[in-house]
Amino acid sequence: MARTQAEPPASQPDARAAWLRDQLERANYAYYVLDQPDLPDAEYDRLFGELQQLEADHPELVTPDSPTQRVGGAVASGFTPVVHDAPMLSLNNGFSDDDIVAFDKRVADALDKPTDLAGSVTDPVEYACELKFDGLAISLRYERGVFVQASTRGDGTTGEDVTENVRTIRSIPLKLKGAHVPALLDVRGEVLMFKRDFARLNERQRAAEQREFANPRNAAAGSLRQLDPKITAQRPLSFFSYGIGVLDGMPMPDTHSALLDWYEALGLPVNRERAVVRGAQGLLEFFRKVGERRESLPYDIDGVVYKVNRRDEQDRLGFVSRAPRFALAHKFPAQEALTKLVAIDVQVGRTGAITPVARLEPVFVGGATVTNATLHNEDEVRRKDIRIGDTVIVRRAGDVIPEVVGALLERRPVDAAEFVMPTECPVCGSKIERLPDEAIARCTGGLFCPAQRKQALWHFAQRRALDIDGLGEKIIDQLVELNLVRTPADLFNLGFATLAELDRFAEKSAQNLLDSLEKAKHTTLARFIYGLGIRHVGESTAKDLAKHFGSLDPIMDASIEELLEVNDVGPIVAESIHQFFAEEHNRTVIDQLRAPGKVTWPEGPPAPKAPQGVLAGKTVVLTGTLPTLTRDAAKEMLEAAGAKVAGSVSKKTDYVVAGAEAGSKLAKAEELGIPVLDEDGLHQLLEGNTQ
């Protein structure tokens, strides 16, 4: 790589520092991205040392994008949450050729691709194909070309700030190349560790008599989440860009492949193992070629990713739940091994799900030693005919979650014992129930069971339930682990002294939480019902129950037949409600919550059988941001007037209320000829003016 820029003299420290930064970043790019080093190590070290000394003599010359800032900052006490500007969505998975053909057909149908008389698509969809790296997804934020923040994926909405650690990854530019860079760019990609670097790291670990890492993914994830950036700086991490979150100040590239080409021009690392293909056959051919080369690749992958290439077609396809409709991860077959099943226990999940777990003789599979594996549910154990004492096939599904695939019947010992599902929860002793047409058995002691305690408390405190501000997951973890809170009722017994002693919980925070708990004592019946966390009872069903019965006792004592009379309550929901209130442990907690000085709400008469209100029977959709009303406030006003508030626009929609930045729902309403109202129109509608 040519270095034609004139070298400023030492007498010009400002220009000299800028020149040194440029030389070092060019060398980093050639070495870590292009894999074509053009500067001897000794010369790199000399230039780096000169820049360090220059910045020490002139601290005002230190810039955030200086290569010297990669060595690691101060030790952090924890990671700060970061709310992503655009969600970091997961991908739906495909495993077989049939899955890929079905995916292509869904996409082609949704895009109205033309077909011939035989039903074959005559203009196949164009896809961008990439590798699916086995690492850790992160988001990089650049402002006017300068790297300012990095965050992990987290739950897709909120991640953790790992800026100082990511700053140490040499392949990530601290400043984008080129004179024309966007005002804001949110780059999505994967932090990973190459196989050779992983081997060298473990050699160092052995030499230092420290624990070795099981696989490159664990090493990468552990390195990125070090509290001390200096440790991360010593770990050989790499990065590949593959997506985008937010772009401001420049037009979005027309295709995904063009986006990746643009990233390369900006100096961002982009993997070269990619292609643009057409139709299902093109996808499968790419998958097979990559599969043949998988073991020879310098890094671990667990599949490939397909994305509809054209941006306008991606926008048309949109998203479903937490995944895009225009993309799919095609996973490789998982790795398998044989071992002996020595016992079957059951574990209770945070939502009460009872899962049989296989206890295994240790076996190394998929890069890790496995001693436990999921059996999913009772039906799966029966279907696979798995017994205690069997020699079983263990697979790391998706190379992460171990599962028992089946038993080798020819090796079955004569004393192999069948699994028997317990009838009582092994944690709390409550009855285990399994609803009709459901595969999962569940503990019915939702408010009482210690295994479900944290989930029950979090749900009870959330905004749409009791709305206990300040009671986050970390505080709940402490309260439960210190045995200060066993049920939601215990929350209202907490005192200032107890809260003030919690880790990282100042006196002001303690008082704020006490104030929030006091406020939460005055709620509504619907919020209280929703806060109980009854399976299948969401916010809407809780409102229907409160409206139908008027008070809590009739709900607790209602028969399944009486529950079925409630709007939108079917047999499964009715059975779930009935089972919840039939469990004495739950009733005990509810009585504690209703004790004097605890939670209260206005009682009301049962609702009339027919819906009342000026908007009875009408369906309304809200979209965008209204000038003065929050989405929740508008929804409550509409429901109070008898309307049903839906989440999507269809031919059954009567009105759409649109505010600022209304998106596809507004366009769909205009396409279908559905009346569109602003906030003033909403108020007129609520007053009975439906014209």
Swiss-Prot record:
Its EC number is 6.5.1.2. Zn(2+) binds at C425, C428, C443, C449. It catalyses: NAD(+) + (deoxyribonucleotide)n-3'-hydroxyl + 5'-phospho-(deoxyribonucleotide)m = (deoxyribonucleotide)n+m + AMP + beta-nicotinamide D-nucleotide. Its cofactor is Mg(2+); Mn(2+). It is an enzyme of class 6 (ligase). The active site is at K132. The keyword Transport does not apply. One of its GO terms (molecular function) is DNA ligase (NAD+) activity. GO terms for biological process: DNA repair; DNA replication. Keywords: DNA damage, DNA repair, DNA replication, Ligase, Magnesium, Manganese, Metal-binding, NAD, Zinc. GO terms for cellular component: cytosol. It comes from the Bacteria. The keyword NAD applies. NCBIfam families: dnlj (TIGR00575), PRK07956.1 (NF005932). Belongs to the NAD-dependent DNA ligase family. LigA subfamily. HAMAP family: DNA_ligase_A. DNA ligase that catalyzes the formation of phosphodiester linkages between 5'-phosphoryl and 3'-hydroxyl groups in double-stranded DNA using NAD as a coenzyme and as the energy source for the reaction. It is essential for DNA replication and repair of damaged DNA. This is DNA ligase. It comes from Burkholderia vietnamiensis (strain G4 / LMG 22486). The gene is ligA.
